[in-house]
């Protein structure tokens, strides 16, 4: 995942860099640095995808009857 793709996913989740940083246990500066890189560290990518999946599941549960 490129830094641009990471930033796009973060944006689609409607999260700020600070919110992602808090969820991943890193600084906002680290998230900013990742977004400027050609390739995001694999663990950061997996963590963000996991958070996105959790958020999606939570939203789907609230859309039920």
Tell me the role of every PLM-derived stretch.
Residues 1, 60-65:
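Short intrinsically disordered terminal tails
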Residues 1-12:
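A short, Lys/Arg-rich alpha-helix, primarily the initiator
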Residues 9, 23, 34:
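Residues in the recognition helix of alpha-helical DNA-binding motifs
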Residues 17-19, 35, 45:
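Acidic-residue sensor for enzyme active/binding pockets
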Residues 26-40:
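Recognition helix of helix-turn-helix/homeodomain-like DNA-binding domains
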Residues 40-62:
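DNA major-groove recognition helix of helix-turn-helix/homeodomain DNA-binding modules
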